[in-house]
A protein has these predicted regions:
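Long, hydrophobic/aromatic-enriched structural stretches that serve as scaffold segments
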Residues: 82-138
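Transmembrane beta-barrel strands of outer-membrane/channel proteins
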Residues: 33-36, 56-64, 106-114, 150-158, ...
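Short loop/turn motifs that connect adjacent beta-strands in outer-membrane beta-barrel proteins
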Residues: 29, 45-53, 95-105, 119, ...
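Detector for outer-membrane/organellar transmembrane beta-barrel domains
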Residues: 149-257
């Protein structure tokens, strides 16, 4: 079975946005999603651990926003400044079990986040562990230049949540939902085109009786390999759409902007786009540098994300330890 891409390339960006989106705003409760929207990038379906192998990924993310938009895409909060710095570690395992024409895998990722927020003259800061991302089952398949996967994801409650705090790291609700992706590598990895689709069902925050609306993501990218060493340059992005209304105590949430206009549902929308470059590390590792810019934003912060993501086979640590 041919795998034209290093296993790192797809999973490397599969979690970073969960830490970068653990940030306050408008859409959904506190405006934040528990889900890693937009994080899927290079070879989302082609990049998985080999059978019986484990990969380790480390994510460093810095998010900067000086604007928070209302439902009309206008600035909603004066003197708004948001800074998020996050580190996340992820272990991804291919169990080597074949079923339904594919291979079975799973992964878990834990983000640690530092947030700083100033708005309308008030300032807040918080550190802690955000929502943990757990995928108990993912099924993927490689045939020629077509790679696909299906998976079921879950997000746990953020462990350090405090109802009385104006700023929290992560969300106090769990969530779950299916995802599907496809990667095309028509010239043995020289060209890569990816798409991923997620549908997220949010559970109720029992501390506030707030239920965020369900969310849909379409994540996409296209890249080209330019050197024999495997350096890849491309673009990626995502379309985010909250498809159902926010509700609190069973009633649809109503918001009012600075001009006195009311909107119902508190739904968020955004388009994200930017460049990225992948540098190979050995045969099965890589580092990704990425910049994403928020556009057409409604009921969410509008800013920029800067990422450094590194992934290597977990066995590399064992070999390094034995060599000492």
């Amino acid at each position: 079975m041919r795998r034209p891409l290093p296993p790192i390339l797809g999973s490397l960006v599969s979690f970073c946005l969960i830490v970068c989106l653990a940030r306050p705003a408008l859409a959904t409760e506190n405006g934040a999603s528990v889900w890693p929207v937009g994080a899927e990038g290079f070879a989302t379906a082609a990049g998985v651990p080999e059978a019986g192998k484990t990969m380790y990924y480390n994510y460093t993310c810095f998010y900067l926003a000086n604007r928070m938009n209302d439902a009309q895409g206008k600035s909603a909060t004066p003197q708004f400044h948001l800074r998020v710095f996050a580190e996340a570690g992820k272990f991804s395992r291919n169990w080597g079990v074949k079923m339904l024409g594919g291979e079975l895998g799973s992964y878990v990722a834990v983000p640690v986040v530092h947030e700083q927020l100033s708005a309308a003259g008030a300032q807040f800061s918080r550190d802690g562990v955000s929502n943990v991302n757990v995928v108990p089952a993912t099924l993927f398949n490689h045939k020629g230049f077509v790679h696909w996967y299906f998976e079921f994801e879950m997000e746990t409650l953020a462990p350090g949540y405090q109802k009385a705090d104006a700023l929290n790291v992560g969300q106090h609700n769990s969530a779950m939902g299916p995802a599907a992706g496809i990667s095309l590598t028509p010239r043995k990895g020289a060209e890569i085109v990816d798409s991923r689709f997620d549908y997220i069902v949010n559970r109720t925050d029992r501390a506030t009786e707030y239920r965020s609306g369900n969310e849909f993501f379409w994540q996409f990218d296209a890249q080209q390999k330019f050197t024999r060493r495997g350096i890849t340059v491309g673009t990626s992005g995502y379309l985010y759409d909250q498809v159902t209304d926010d509700k609190q105590f069973g009633t649809t949430v109503v918001t009012t902007n600075a001009g006195g206009m009311q909107t119902t549902g508190n739904r968020g929308r955004s388009l994200d786009f930017g460049p990225q470059i992948t540098l190979p590390i050995g045969k099965h590792g890589a580092a990704i540098l990425k910049w994403d810019h928020d556009m057409l934003v409604q009921n969410k912060p509008q800013g920029n994300s800067f990422w450094l993501q590194i992934g290597v086979p977990f066995g590399l640590f064992h070999r390094s330890a034995k060599g000492q």
